[in-house]
Amino acid sequence: MLVGQRIGGELIGATMSEVEPGNRLWPYHTHYLNEEWVIVLRGEPTLRTPEGEHVLNEGDVVCFPRGKAGAHQIINGTDSSIRVLMLSSMIRGEIIEYLDTGKVLAKGVEDEDIMFARPGPTPEYWEGED
């Protein structure tokens, strides 16, 4: 549920999610333009970060800064559903890196996907521009 949009939010987004047992909220990733926070509303999700995995409890709040230090993933390793509220800044345009696979997603200012690729050889600046 996109809570932020429903209440007219423009600069801060909020999404409430339920995660069933054995599932993950998203792949392990990091944002380069937007900061995110998680608030645990129900259950005991496992949080994966660059420091490893640890279990969160109801009421816990964690901030994920921009860049690789803020990489994160929410995992439900329990036998009942969990509920979390994700908050984020809403800077238009975004670069998201999926660290397990090396994929990178670039989003435009209208939230459209511009590029979704794995890094490879870097093209020369003028390559193909003739």
Describe the residue ranges of each PLM region.
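Extracellular structured ligand-interaction cores
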Residues: 11, 71, 84
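Short, charged/polar surface micro-motifs in flexible loops or helix N-caps
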Residues: 20-24, 44, 53, 68-70, ...
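Short strand-connecting beta-turns/loops that link adjacent beta-strands
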Residues: 8, 33, 68, 79-80
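Short, conserved beta-strand element in jelly-roll/cupin
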Residues: 16-20, 30-48, 87-91
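Short beta-strand His + acidic residue motifs that chelate non-heme Fe in jelly-roll/DSBH
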Residues: 27, 47-48, 64, 71-77
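Short acidic-glycine-tyrosine-enriched beta hairpin
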Residues: 50-67
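Double-stranded beta-helix
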Residues: 75-130
